[in-house]
């Protein structure tokens, strides 16, 4: 089988079976490593056979309990049918932001038990579902905003909670069987025609 390793600093920090097929990581204030797994990545039409999670992909928390620089434990924070190969994660306070086209999801742990008490779709409408050209990394910016990147597997038609709508497409057509028909020339609320990959800024309220 395939063994996945994670290196932080000068040596090997963790390896399978603490996690499988990591697509993105973040580190919280307790120095724990949060891993967004993409085990179920592109398994349609017999592609990528092997391990599969029927209940959806996972976010796991990997910990070095004794401070020796090597992780000993992991726990599942969330496993969700809406998670199909998530490609980005940001842990900000008690909120965990996960990029997984068509959604940017927010899981909130209100009681500190390392399990989500609520789930919110902060933004939706990104193309590239189950595709590596979809919604990618999400990070907290120094301005207090959320910054994230999306690839060219559109179309992306995303309406923020203040009504502003991003519309972006391109000539790229290899979006897989779950993709909508991509098209260039879409005009956003700002009057601009955005195309290809994008870097976007939003906020924790979905505006």
Q: Each predicted region: which residue ranges?
A:
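Beta-propeller blade termini and top-face loops
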Residues: 1-207
